[in-house]
Amino acid sequence: MKLHQLQALMAVADGGGIRAAARILGLSQAAVTRALRELEEEQGLALLVRHAGGARLTPAGKILLPHATQIASQLQRAQRELAQLRGQTPARLCVGVTPWLGQTLLAATVRAFRQALPSVQLEIYEGLQAVSLPLLRSGLMHLALGPAATLPAQEFIHLPLARYRMKVLASHEHPRRQARSLGELLEDDWVMNFGHSGYAPVVHELFERHGFSIATERIIGAQSSAMLSSLIVDAGLLGYSPEPMLLCAPLRDRTQALDLVEPLADAEVSVIHLRDQALDTAALCFIQCLQDSLKARGRSRSAEHRQLAAMLELRF
């Protein structure tokens, strides 16, 4: 397999046909067709189905596509790093940050990082799994800060940072804000963030392991911390979130954690990166700045900083 063949496959997937792929790549249609035909002949498999409206990937093409994307991304990264050595382009670091950490620790971490490596171009995403995992796999994101318990170990490496408690959250006006058991909350509507595994693991963790069953239509999935928080505060839904979210706007001062008899799960925030992608100097510096910020919270004079430190058990 050659790079130009994989680029042709990716362009067809993006554009939906040979003509669009040629336009994306700046090549002739004949050149794109030739590259794809050579790739199919080498693999002994049909990778495309041509039709009147363009072309679509076969099952074999769909299997090859993510590998092609990763190979192209890694080559681009190698080209960037070599260009950095030549002084032609600035270094770049892309990080996904879980929402509660973004609101409580990101500012101090970024200040320290900018002082240490001011020439690095930093890009930050709100790092819910639905956003971070595809970017990590493509090589466009270098590391993510978030829960790693359900991630495949053969694909990702994770460095634990801190353990925290999960909590059931309700607004101060919620009619069941004084509930003492999950059994009292089965007829209420909930909002949760699901990882790549869907809602089933969360439902088991929160309800089923305690002997309760809840209708899944009562659970709204929110892939945005802003939407999740708004639905708890403004729509009167119950939430299941990391305890540090209580320190984050708009939940701070408007919600409370329910004091339930059932023990809720602990979770862990980790540094996550691809197993086959080593961390460079910028990534390692960012991690060190974050670890320093975490440790500093326990020594801070700020009551809010000490409150966060009390919610966390450091794991490094």
Model regions: which residues?
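A short LG(V/I)-centered, amphipathic sequence patch enriched
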Residues: E40-K62
